[in-house]
């Protein structure tokens, strides 16, 4: 539900994070937070056990379809931001399935990276927590160098310590899929910031 609301919010020009915060003030409402998809060894798989012996499970399948579509939704945002840029490079920060864990099983970051590569983007990855990921994990400086867009996929607390003014990127763009970073700090460092689910975004890519 939260991820579908995020997509609706972007189309309607509203901030889904504000809308969810207001809705959750009602004592009988508890909408979760949107994001780039759902991973791990439980949530993406276990609900499907309920569908094995029943045909009346439309909501379960629909929920999975929406969550599975979120990496593609992030790709659409990147297309708009980096349109026309030659040989674009993305830096993915966070590849484990959730913040402050090393587990990368069923992580939506993997699907996102594969989609990005299929679209012709160069992709570099950085994650100080993850282990056993299929793509090489670089140190922060190397992952950021000459990149055109940072894509935060996992909300590791250590990422709050990034100093965006020190990043040696070719173009300064940030997509925050978790509404996690200090966006004013990034904007003050010259970054064009897009937050998943924030329909107020009207920025354009900063391209050299």
Enumerate the predicted regions with their spans:
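Structural/interface elements that position substrates and couple domains in central-metabolism enzymes
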Residues: 1-208
